[in-house]
Amino acid sequence: MTEQAISFAKDFLAGGIAAAISKTAVAPIERVKLLLQVQHASKQIAADKQYKGIVDCIVRIPKEQGVLSFWRGNLANVIRYFPTQALNFAFKDKYKQIFLGGVDKHTQFWRYFAGNLASGGAAGATSLCFVYPLDFARTRLAADVGKSGTEREFRGLGDCLVKITKSDGIRGLYQGFSVSVQGIIIYRAAYFGVYDTAKGMLPDPKNTHIVVSWMIAQTVTAVAGVVSYPFDTVRRRMMMQSGRKGADIMYTGTVDCWRKIFRDEGGKAFFKGAWSNVLRGMGGAFVLVLYDELKKVI
């Protein structure tokens, strides 16, 4: 193996272990966020049984479904990390070459900004093509509020993928794909724009104290997450459609989903669970610290 391959394998392993630990640690917050996002589109949750907010959700889940149910869908989320990282690594440089080749960051800022969005969006969309079914299964398993085997919609990851493929074909596993790609581009635009602006306002960007850098990263991640959150809500709602037939189908498409959420639930509905998303983002910062520590050991 070449030195580059060994270095990638070490990074890949350290990143995977760090991601598995952090994703498992924040899985309860992730499940609360997903339930608040999709409960209006769930056949299992009646209108009078819907969760009133984050605290109500955290209190009721262990009572109604057991403590371990906080980790429903976590396995799919952990597995998803590995192909995503490998694909990002494989495509990242190629897309940067296509969109950012010969572009000067300082003299052609807007071209650099657009190229960064395009390369990030293209790399994200390419990775999503391969890992989207895992994200889909994670959402459906997290949204499954049945207490025991008979009440559950799916027995696990494999059962979810098989049932939806039988019912709707491969297309069923890709519900909400287009709005996911839009969300990636919006997230990157917000992240890149805010981060560059914040760094530009510092007196000495290269010698910034680690605490200040961490605070900027936290703020940028939170802002980008909130700005792109409505796209995440719409894609999760679209995922809930797979397996439904006839009158059970709530949305005829992505545009119809945007329209109906706004009309029936109001603009605030697009941001349900957004606060728990900000809390989960703090877990992202923990990943980076853990990743650096693991690299020292491996």
Curated annotation (Swiss-Prot):
**Name this polypeptide is given:** ADP/ATP translocase 3
Query: Catalyses which reaction?
Result: ADP(in) + ATP(out) = ADP(out) + ATP(in); H(+)(in) = H(+)(out)
Activity regulation annotation text = The matrix-open state (m-state) is inhibited by the membrane-permeable bongkrekic acid (BKA). The cytoplasmic-open state (c-state) is inhibited by the membrane-impermeable toxic inhibitor carboxyatractyloside (CATR). Proton transporter activity is inhibited by ADP:ATP antiporter activity.
Could you provide one GO biological process annotation from this protein's UniProt record? mitochondrial ATP transmembrane transport
Residues that the record marks as modified (N-acetylmethionine) are 1
Reading the lineage from the top rank, the first entry is Eukaryota
Membrane-crossing ranges are 8-37, 75-99, 110-130, 179-199, 211-231, 274-291
